[in-house]
Regions:
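A short acidic, Gly/Pro-enriched loop at the edge of an enzyme's catalytic core
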Residues: 109, 122-135
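Conserved Class I S-adenosyl-L-methionine
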Residues: 180-207
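Bacterial N-terminal signal peptides
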Residues: 7-17
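Short glycine-dipeptide loop
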Residues: 64, 87-88, 162-168
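Conserved alpha-helix/loop element of class I SAM-dependent methyltransferases that forms part
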Residues: 47-66
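Core SAM-dependent methyltransferase catalytic element
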Residues: 219-244
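A short glycine-rich, Lys/Arg-flanked "PGG" loop and its adjoining helix->strand segment in the class I
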Residues: 82-83, 148-164
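Class I SAM-dependent methyltransferase SAM/SAH-binding core
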Residues: 68-122
Length: 244
């Protein structure tokens, strides 16, 4: 019995090591998804920095859920979210100009659809369980429709798109204390206090925040793509909930 237990523990340890850092979320679906040899090597190389298993767990994403992913870029999270929610769930990739990689993902994953609208729109066909965006909110501040920036429009659209009790997850690069939203177009950072204030003003309540992607060595003075800091920026994670 003892030998069987030791063998089981060893197997689980190997699986966890293969899948990346899963200490916070030892669930087998996430481990299997991350360990999938079919994932692009470039995606697998980013797992250690992005900690997707822990992030998905913090987001409280459920199997079978519907998700609107804002500005998904090359689809790193799109692939993972699609695999995690499974065939009973759906990912709506909100992208006005989808990348070739995102177009390929939508073509090969039946539960992924690309939906396009004006900046600040989330044109989903039915209310969703979650709105998800990573490293984009600061860029939304740099685009306007009339006198209103796209961040405010997306916050309003997220509130409208979500089911009562739905989650709005935002991850972004932290700016220096006092910077507010003044460096969104230069350093591509924003202070989390600004995001909290703006999202709560759209009707959401803060449901949780995580230090999972904090990096104390980042002094917030460099642009996020500069050599030595790219992939190692100090990032905040905010989980908001639409009241029921």
């Amino acid at each position: 019995m003892r030998h069987a237990m030791v063998g089981t523990i060893a197997a689980l340890a190997i699986l966890a090591a293969t899948a990346g850092s899963l200490a916070a979320t030892p669930s087998s679906p996430l481990a299997a998804i991350l360990a999938d040899p079919g994932r692009p090597e470039a995606d697998r190389a980013r797992d250690a920095d992005r900690k997707p298993a822990e992030l998905i767990a913090f987001a409280k994403l459920r199997r079978g859920a519907s998700v609107a992913e804002l500005a998904p870029g090359g689809g790193y999270f799109t692939r993972l979210l699609s695999a995690f929610v499974g065939p009973k769930g759906h990912i709506y990739a909100v992208a006005a100009r989808p990348s070739p990689a995102l177009t390929e993902i939508a073509g090969s994953h039946p539960n992924v659809s690309i939906v396009a609208g004006k900046p600040g729109e989330i044109p989903v066909p039915a209310p969703v369980d979650m709105v998800w965006t990573t490293l984009n909110y600061h860029d939304f501040k740099n685009s306007k429709q009339g006198d209103t920036d796209a961040a405010a429009l997306f916050n309003q659209a997220a509130f409208k798109a979500l089911k009562p009790g739905g989650i709005y997850l935002i991850v972004d690069h932290q700016a220096a204390p006092g910077a507010g939203a003044s460096v969104t177009s230069t350093l591509h950072r924003i202070e989390s206090v600004v995001v909290k204030r703006e999202v709560e003003s759209a009707g959401f309540r803060l449901d949780g925040e995580s230090d999972l992607l904090r990096h104390a060595a980042d002094d917030h003075s460099l642009g996020v793509v500069e050599t030595g800091i790219r992939g190692k920026t100090d990032q905040f994670i905010l989980r908001f909930r639409k009241p029921r």
